[in-house]
From Swiss-Prot:
Known cofactor(s): heme
Protein known as: Cytochrome P450 3A31
Originating organism: Mesocricetus auratus
Purpose of the protein: Cytochromes P450 are a group of heme-thiolate monooxygenases. In liver microsomes, this enzyme is involved in an NADPH-dependent electron transport pathway. It oxidizes a variety of structurally unrelated compounds, including steroids, fatty acids, and xenobiotics.
Matching InterPro entries: Cyt_P450 (IPR001128), Cyt_P450_CS (IPR017972), Cyt_P450_E_CYP3A (IPR008072), Cyt_P450_E_grp-II (IPR002402), Cyt_P450_sf (IPR036396), Cytochrome_P450_3A (IPR050705)
PROSITE patterns: CYTOCHROME_P450 (PS00086)
Compartments it resides in: Endoplasmic reticulum membrane; Microsome membrane
GO annotation, cellular component aspect: endoplasmic reticulum membrane
Origin organism lineage: Eukaryota, Metazoa, Chordata, Craniata, Vertebrata
Signals that turn on the gene: Induced by phenobarbital and repressed by 3-methylcholanthrene or dexamethasone.
E.C. designation(s): 1.14.14.1
Amino acid sequence: MDLTSVLSLETWVLLAISLVLLYRLGTHKYDIFKKQGIPGPKPLPFLGNVLNYYKGIWTFDIECHKKYGKIWGLFEGQRPLFTVTDTEMIKNVLVKECYSIFTNRRDFGPVGIMSKAVSISKDEEWKRIRALLSPTFTSGKLKEMFPIIEQYGDILVKFLRREAEKGNPVTTKEVFGAYSMDVITSTAFGVSVDSLNNPKDLLWKGRKLLRFDFFDPLFLSVVLFPFLIPIYEKLNVSMFPKDSISFFRKFVDKTKENRLDYNQKHRVDFLQLMMNSHDNSKDSHKALSDMEIIAQSIIFIFAGYDTTSSTLSFALYLLATHPDVQKKLQEEIDIALPNKARPSYDKVMEMEYLDMVLNETLRLYPIGSRLERVCKQDVEMDGVFVPKGSIVMVPVFALHYDPQYWPEPEKFRPERFSKENKGSIDPYIFLPFGNGPRNCIGMRFALMNMKLALTKVLQNFSLQPCKETQIPMKLSRKAMLQPEKPIILKVVPRDAIITGA
């Protein structure tokens, strides 16, 4: 049947007008960059540029940086992203105008009680929570926590030794995921969990928190249609798995009750330090509420578990595939800790080459591949008009691979971070933990934890590639930076003396 004979001319005209109006509805915001002469990839109606992310957000960002230069425009749905790589503009966003204009991160969807977490909260609420949490991460508090973390380094060494004796290669993410969970639960809650040898609910619930993908239907729906967020909130829909949140909420509540019953104010874990804020706060309304304490506790797990285990996995892969670097680092460790002496906080943090290796790992594999801030008011920045509600995005991964700042950026060269070279590194180009007042609050804790783990492992073992090791390693296309295939390495004992065994 011929449609032209069935539908009248008026119907065809109405249909054509409807399609034009639909197209205009899906593209009417897309001229914001064109009017200002800002380049960028062409967006699709309603979708914007999100389909470009399928190849990997970091790959897409590198391509755009090469093609468009220091500033370009993207759209996620119809929301504009001003992408900047100019260091002065980055400094303005992350530091100078942090408190006035670029205070908040974007809404990533309905999050329930997690809206109280320090990394998600906004404006004055964020300032208050951040101020109360900051004393938890002083060098003095970290030194007190160091012996707690070291005992899990001993457990890690014992586990690796058993696997080495059996001739089993190890899947690094699984091993360091369990190690990270144990360290977090002990330092955050004072609870001893041996996830390496007895994986239980705590580890699995923690893993479930991290199953995040940009193309998850719920996440994609709020990116394309932000007006759905309050609707989801009213329906009690959350980006975080309900069973995991419920599990950790009960876990924190029970731990808190035990503390109150036995008056354990002397403890140095994060939970106790947060509980003590009730007593230490001069103004009662400034103290952390019970709900805020639960949110911070869960975000410690969410933020600390994957970042630490992934970075350690990447570091050991790089060391296994660069035996000269591994040997040099082992020599530094042996000199600092002769006869396999037990590490101390000061000794670990003073090791220069260890710091260089870890920084170069974080350059090559920054777990947070982007930094984003929401513009709270219309503002002109370096001649560019940024309207209220827009997102200003810093493509960290692309900056870390920019040959203008890093010669042969794809190569693993710890010497980039030597004393001689470190002074020339722009702090707004190397951004593994962000910068400014809203940088990663747990940065010092994470660095201490990772340095201790590397020290314990390399004191006792050498890492080698095996037949299961993917060389060269390819990155997954998922939102969280991770390898396409699990990193699997052979662990070889350095000698018969194993500390912590």
